[in-house]
């Protein structure tokens, strides 16, 4: 998910990037600044709140449902959430969603007792089915898969090591964002308007594998996974091909926006997505996470019911290990500064009221 124009694994008792016994004596960071170890929830109720830093910088504040001003991560906990998801871009404009921004937000979340998912886009801006743009700093190597694999591995390791240095222990790591047609186009693109691209799958698997290996090297206990859009579709073919290329994944991440499919009701899309989640988990023997979900606040009561129905259904599927709302904290027509230059409107699936309180949509997580 990038924008909408106005229109996860049994309980893990150790943190995913754990320190060695006795390492406390080696840590010179003041204890009060180190997040406490966060237990990985059996079912993640989460939100991607990667826009928080920029929202706060523009003056936006947050409140609990009763109107009490509070830090956004405390607000999320008050809504029944136990996890957050944070994206990482390589060298973004203004630094938003860059490594440093991600680490700061992850540290705040961990200090609040929330488990953390890290979502690598491998781009300087949103990567999704419509665009998977090469990071500018990597362009000199964009025709050399081996060189790019090295850059991707180094970037992945650098971000995860920076998180570890702040005491943050990612529970889940996404290698790419909505990579149905690969990533790092055109090098690891899978098809174009002429059909399948020769060698595309092999290059994609090579680069995905570099990210997976880097994530496991730094965070051996983390759940590392690829991510596709459209949870309601039959996506088994895609994961079969990825496995055929020799790639590994510990889980599957999917996006689900039940009110955006033309010709289908939200209830139909929910039902199809839940069925597909069950079949994917059975086919590949891994858990499934809904890494993105969103509904439209313009029809708040109906949308709240749609989300609650989906989460209730997901909770009944043993292999479904979590649901994350995408950017629920957006309110009051706010949008990132860069959207203006792009001619984009505001994200239309925020789930907070005009004064910065969670709307009834967020009750679905309680």
Residue ranges and their predicted role:
Residues 45-49, 84-86, 116-120, 171-175, ...:
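Hydrophobic faces of well-ordered beta-strands that scaffold small-molecule active sites
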Residues 72-73, 221-223, 231-302, 312-315, ...:
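Glycoside hydrolase catalytic-domain groove-lining segments
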Residues 35-72:
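Boundary/entry segment of secreted carbohydrate-active catalytic domains
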Residues 57-61, 282, 298-313, 317-366:
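Aromatic-rich peripheral "rim/lid" segments of glycoside hydrolase catalytic domains that contact
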